Amino acid sequence: MKEFDLESYDYDLPKELIANYPILPKEKAKLLVYERRSQKITHTTFEHVLDFFPKNALVVLNDTKVIKARIFGSKHAFLPSKTTEVFFHRFFKDNTALTQIKGKIKVGDKIFFDAHYHAEVLELLHNGQRLIAFYGNKTPLNQANILKLLEQYGHMPLPPYIKRADESLDAHEYQSVFAKHMGAVAAPTASLHFSQNTLEKLLKDFKHAFLTLHVGAGTFLGVETKDIREHQIHTEVLRIPKKSQEILQKSQEILCIGTTALRSVEYFKRLENPNQEAFECDIFLHLANPILHVNYLLTNFHLPKSSLLMLVSAMVGLEKTKEIYQIAIEKKYRFYSYGDGMLIL
């Protein structure tokens, strides 16, 4: 069936529609509103986004905070040049972390970040990840100090389709105004559309709940299996506070800000008796595993053959999704992380 064929999720996007910078002010970004019942499409801007939110809906937001996850070092202690790039993915345990390292590397290699801080390669994993340990003055660093090291020397992990180096504006624009808990290596991009003013209006006028899904590097990996149902999606760390769990359990109508919030809600609502706050979320939503508990979604325009495009298709239908994306291309909407948005009602 074509809805499970990977090639069905391909489309051509003119390169000039890939957004390399955000629209400022945020309210000026374009918004495509699609009402499924009437099939009506409205073209507007984020200045009016809250006007379209159903009044009784619970709005769910992901308050993860992006780490400056790209850090450069040298394989030599005297630091002639920092040309070795380490991309931090997530903590493993204690002072160790799963990373990607560009270039040739072997177990035992050291990467020096300055005269005091370095990392040592412990293991080369089959999936391309490298397990490394962080040290300060030859003493194992705790996780809080590793985050401080990344904050001091790291760079914002812009997605690979943004073809430029990170700049000072990315430190705040590639971060939502409600980002709180450090741990993501990619931004939950629908959240980037909210200015402080729009957020305050949302919190005042709508029921809302926060959760934390630390977006992983796997979010940029395309689906590679010909039959999308065979794809194994990445696992991400999810935390839902008890207060938010209680609100979610009571709510009949849910609007998610972004696919990360939607995946989190769907994962949580399918658990029989959740009795903890921390989870490992690995839910892959598509037409054979449809959305059951979320009614509305605010999202960006996603990459061809991506699991996120399949999620949107699970909500809208494959043919309608392709039709809407074609309209967005014709109307010169900007795509991907710094691009425009789509509200599905």
UniProtKB/Swiss-Prot annotation:
UniProt-listed InterPro entries: QueA, QueA_dom1, QueA_dom2, QueA_sf
Primary residence? cytoplasm
Q: Per the UniProt record, which EC number(s) apply here?
A: 2.4.99.17
GO-annotated biological processes: queuosine biosynthetic process; tRNA wobble guanine modification
- Where in or outside the cell? Cytoplasm
Q: Name one GO cellular component term.
A: cytoplasm
- Report the protein name in the record: S-adenosylmethionine:tRNA ribosyltransferase-isomerase
Name the source organism. Helicobacter pylori (strain Shi470)
Gene of this entry: queA
